[in-house]
Amino acid sequence: MGWTFPRLIATRNEWFDDWCDHDGPACYELGTGGPRGGQIEWHYVGETGNERARIVCYARSGSHLSEIIDRHLRQGWFLYYRGFAVDTKAEARRIQDERLRRFEYDWNILLNDSSRRGS
């Protein structure tokens, strides 16, 4: 199937979580950019067993990324999402792990450093 086109999911004052229609596993990326979606910088890669539930979780500010996302939105950035639907959560994790080996995602690095310090 491949990666979806980037989708705007949040501005400073509004979350858009009603577009997601996939209830299955996916690998996904979160990034920031301007209002028209140009020059998106991808900050985070993750995997989930249910794409729709994950997006709703982000929209309700109940995720482990809440502080990072809120800070970027307050600075005037727009939050974008793109996903890669797969058949199993294991396949989503495999894609995530490949991307983590290949690219440096600053939010993943920041969260991993924080969790190591807390242990």
Model-derived features with residue positions:
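GIY-YIG nuclease catalytic motif and its immediate N-terminal context
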Residues: 1-54, 77, 83-98, 117-119
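Intrinsic disorder/low-complexity signature
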Residues: 10, 67-69, 105, 109-110
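A broadly used, surface-exposed interaction patch
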Residues: 52-75
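Intrinsically disordered, low-complexity regulatory tails
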Residues: 102-119
